[in-house]
Amino acid sequence: MQRSFYEILGIESDASNIEIKRAYRAMLLETHPDKSGLNYNSNGNNTSSHSVTDIQEAYQTLIDQDLRKKYDEELAESFKKLGFHNAGDGLDLFSLDLFDYSGDEQSFSMNCPRCQITDGFQLTEDALEEHAIDYEGGGYFVLVQCSACSLWLKVLFDVMEE
């Protein structure tokens, strides 16, 4: 999954136009070869994670209120298709079924949908048993934070009887 425009500019989804403009200017300076001190490969290409085109597209979309509203709706829909739903309590719901399971380590892992860090969310079977909370819709849930960013998830699961 590619980074959102908010992540490209390094801002929160409720950022004001002033914050968007500041972030845009800062990101352009960060990618400018004479200003940034970033590394360039032998072809003269910037090796940073965002191109000027990405930064400009993010800015142009987020600074226009109509485009931003449409973008936010599309972003929310894309997260829903991935099984990522807002629970209304500020936490996003994910099913444990979407996590990768390692039988050797008896653990579940998933890349963070926000910062894209590999295995940003990790849960062991012991942690699930120890911290499980009854979920009003049936089954259980645990709260878990990404190891690299501030995103918290509510992970839903059922217990399989052996």
Swiss-Prot record:
Q: Where do the annotations place Zn(2+) binding?
A: C112, C115, C146, C149
**Keyword Signal on this protein?**
no
The residue ranges of the DPH-type MB domain are 90-158
Q: Tell me, what is an example of a GO biological process annotation in this record? A: protein histidyl modification to diphthamide
User: What pathway, per the record?
Assistant: Protein modification; peptidyl-diphthamide biosynthesis
List, alphabetically, the CDD domains matched. DnaJ
One GO MF term on file is:
metal ion binding
Where does the record place it? Cytoplasm; Nucleus
Keywords for the protein's UniProt record, in alphabetical order: Cytoplasm, Iron, Metal-binding, Nucleus, Zinc
One annotated Gene Ontology cellular component of this protein? cytoplasm
Is Zinc among the key words of this record? Answer: yes
Residues forming the J domain are: 4-75
PROSITE patterns xrefs: DNAJ_2, DPH_MB
| Record comment regarding domains | The DPH-type metal-binding (MB) domain can bind either zinc or iron ions.
Please explain the role this protein plays, according to its UniProt record. Answer: Required for the first step of diphthamide biosynthesis, the transfer of 3-amino-3-carboxypropyl from S-adenosyl-L-methionine to a histidine residue. Diphthamide is a post-translational modification of histidine which occurs in elongation factor 2.
> What family is this protein classified in?
Belongs to the DPH4 family.
Protein name, UniProt field: Diphthamide biosynthesis protein 4
Q: Which species does the entry assign this protein to?
A: Kluyveromyces lactis (strain ATCC 8585 / CBS 2359 / DSM 70799 / NBRC 1267 / NRRL Y-1140 / WM37) (Yeast)
